[in-house]
């Protein structure tokens, strides 16, 4: 009961403070109308922030009050001696105990699932911000993503930067970039930005800016992404000139040998793939691509563009919509996701533990990437992924960062010195370095 009383007192106190704050806000608005100088404008802005903060606190206290009342009702509800809940349809008690009550009031089944995001609305919203705040938010959600998500899970956060502002009646106010940090039970609206959607849209719109600033997700760093993109134009040019095992051209008698070789190159296969993609466009994504083309974004229009692999530098969870119709781009992202799974499998294999513990350390980046990308309206060409793996797989695995950078001989020597010293000063078993 004391909890309810305390919460009610807090609600009453905050309601009184809110009445006073709203009156002060009205006074400040009148003062700005009479004399719109900097002092009055700053006062108005401070009053608006105070009212907003009090409204948020009051709403929070009211939610807590509702939760407390609900808990109290559950605690005082009489229990059935048979152990069966009054509204349970079973005539005899189940062998399972009653678990949590899942509240589905907040779920709107009319909203599309998270896989069918409104990419046009999301793209227009993001393009409306300045490049500095977009790239800083990307850094916080990729390079420092794990920490940011952990600290803000279950909330809707706002990114603020001095370069992002808007003028309202001559008053300069911050223009916040909103990103929702969902939990597993959250239902996202089609136009709502989440960390995954934000990384996807920004990576697709601004790969050149990401490349210049070398913004990279840790999961891409450990698979050797920096090494892979170092000489990308030469790397992809050599790949395109290689013979493709999946092409069997119809050769007419008397065709020159040189022309026969050209018709079997990977470049020809990619041209055929481009023809397939050109027939499978989705109207909303086309609208986004046209809108982006009229502004600052630097989306690649070909896989041999210098910035093409940087589309995946921050590990988007699907192929960005702005380059999904570029032959080989969606498959390049799938190749990177397989490399992430391969590295995690290697790490799980070398750890000590039961088979079950090792399996838990494996990942399924590829399956997730495949499912999300194909939900955008295209089927990935597994043959292109296979070509990438045959060409670069061995090289990339050799450049994985496996958390063991010490030379084996050096490690053995250091361990021997540790063992010797521990034996001199203690009878305990020396730990491994």
UniProtKB/Swiss-Prot annotation:
Q: Where is this motif: YxxL?
A: 178-181
UniProt-annotated stretches for the region Interaction with host RPS19? 150-175
Q: Which domain of life is it from?
A: Viruses
* Compositionally skewed regions (Basic and acidic residues) per UniProt: 67-78
EC numbers, comma separated: 3.1.-.-
- Annotated membrane-spanning segments are none
Q: Which InterPro entries match?
A: Hanta_nucleocap
Q: Where is this region: Interaction with host UBE2I/UBC9?
A: 188-191
> What enzyme class is recorded for this protein?
hydrolase
Instruction: Write out the ranges of the annotated region (Chaperone activity).
Output: 1-100
Recorded GO molecular functions are: endonuclease activity; RNA binding
According to the record, the residues making up region (Viral panhandle binding) are: 1-175
Query: Per the record, which residues fall in region Homomultimerization?
Result: 1-79, 100-125, 377-425
Q: Which UniProt keywords apply?
A: Capsid protein, Chaperone, Coiled coil, Endonuclease, Helical capsid protein, Host cytoplasm, Host Golgi apparatus, Hydrolase, Nuclease, Ribonucleoprotein, RNA-binding, Viral nucleoprotein, Virion
Q: Which portions of the sequence form the region Viral RNA-binding?
A: 175-217
Interaction with glycoprotein N: annotated span = 80-248
Domain notes for this protein: The N-terminus is required for chaperone activity and, in trimeric form, this region likely serves in high affinity vRNA panhandle recognition. The N-terminus also contains a coiled coil region, which probably participates in but is insufficient to initiate N trimerization. The YxxL motif is indispensable for the interaction with host MAP1LC3B. The central region is involved in specific RNA-binding. Has distinct cap- and RNA-binding sites so it can bind simultaneously both the vRNA and mRNA cap.
Family, as annotated: Belongs to the hantavirus nucleocapsid protein family.
The name on file for this protein is: Nucleoprotein
């Amino acid at each position: 009961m004391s909890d309810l009383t305390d919460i009610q007192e807090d609600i009453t106190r905050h309601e009184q403070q809110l009445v006073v704050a709203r009156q002060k806000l009205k006074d400040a608005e009148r003062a700005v109308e009479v004399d719109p100088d900097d002092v009055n404008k700053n006062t108005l802005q401070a009053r608006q922030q105070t009212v907003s903060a009090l409204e948020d606190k009051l709403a929070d206290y009211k939610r807590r009050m509702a939760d407390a009342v609900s808990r109290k009702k559950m605690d005082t509800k009489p229990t059935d001696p048979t152990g069966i809940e009054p509204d349970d349809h079973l005539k005899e008690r189940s062998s399972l105990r009653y678990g949590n009550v899942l509240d589905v009031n907040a779920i709107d089944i009319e909203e599309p699932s998270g896989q069918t995001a409104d990419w046009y609305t999301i793209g227009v919203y993001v393009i409306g911000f300045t490049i500095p705040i977009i790239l800083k938010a990307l850094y916080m959600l990729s390079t420092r993503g794990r920490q940011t998500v952990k600290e803000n899970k279950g909330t809707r956060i706002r990114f603020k930067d001095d370069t992002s502002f808007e003028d309202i009646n001559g008053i300069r106010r911050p223009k916040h970039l909103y990103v929702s940090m969902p939990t597993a039970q959250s239902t996202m609206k089609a136009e709502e930005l989440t960390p995954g959607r934000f990384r996807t849209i920004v990576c697709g719109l601004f790969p050149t800016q990401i490349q210049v600033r070398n913004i990279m997700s840790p999961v891409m760093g450990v698979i050797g992404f920096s090494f892979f993109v170092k000489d990308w134009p030469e790397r992809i040019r050599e790949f395109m000139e290689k013979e493709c095992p999946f092409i069997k051209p119809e050769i007419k008698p008397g065709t020159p040998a040189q022309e026969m070789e050209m018709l079997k190159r990977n470049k020809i296969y990619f041209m055929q793939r481009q023809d397939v993609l050109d027939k499978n466009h989705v109207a909303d994504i086309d609208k986004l691509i046209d809108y982006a083309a009229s502004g600052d974004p630097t989306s690649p229009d070909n896989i041999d563009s210098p910035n093409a692999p940087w589309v995946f530098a921050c590990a988007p969870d699907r192929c960005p919509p702005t380059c999904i119709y570029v032959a080989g781009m969606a498959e390049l992202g799938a190749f990177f996701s397989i490399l992430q799974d391969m590295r995690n499998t290697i790490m799980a294999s070398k750890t000590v533990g039961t088979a079950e513990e090792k399996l838990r350390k494996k990942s399924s980046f590829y399956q997730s990437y495949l499912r999300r990308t194909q939900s955008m309206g295209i089927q990935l060409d597994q043959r292109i992924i296979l070509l990438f793996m045959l060409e670069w797989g061995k090289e990339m695995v050799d450049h994985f960062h496996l958390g063991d950078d010490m030379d084996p001989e050096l490690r053995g020597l250091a361990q021997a010195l540790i063992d010797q010293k521990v034996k001199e000063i203690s009878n305990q078993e020396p730990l491994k370095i």
